[in-house]
Amino acid sequence: LDIFTVLESSRIDGYVDELYPGVMKMYEMVRLAALESRPDVTDLPAREALVEFMIRVSLGQVDEMIVPSEHKDAARKLRRLIRQVTSTDAIVEDAAEAAIRAYSILIDVKNDELEDDDYEELEDDEEDSDDSGDDEDVVDPEEVIQQFMGMAAPDGDGEGEQEDGSDEQDFEG
């Protein structure tokens, strides 16, 4: 799953939860079944473990949330993003913005293999759900895009770039 899909699914789930409470019993059964089929977080490298954490939050898990110890702050920020998009006031653009923010958090996490003792439980902090609006969470979408563009070509072949470093392309049509 990609990050946007997790966030947009969470947004829709929040909408369904609020506006259609009659379907929630069956919905919860499906969520629980989905959680049971998820991989063990401690079997995953750091970044993948945080993505799995996001999936689990989106499926409604609150207890026994295991995350890489070194990245508990990142996990809290990711959980806050998911909780913010579950508001019935949230729109698809909010999920898209949250995805950019999530990517900016995850891009700084190396996907290193970890030992079992490098993980610990993250408590359910209800203050994550309020709109604390930490300024440190504000990201420049252009900066995130540039970070991804830099990661896209790790072999550095520079294909498609002009000698002056620009990425100008000629389109005919």
Where are these regions (language model features)?
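Short, functionally important secondary-structure microenvironments
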Residues: 1-173
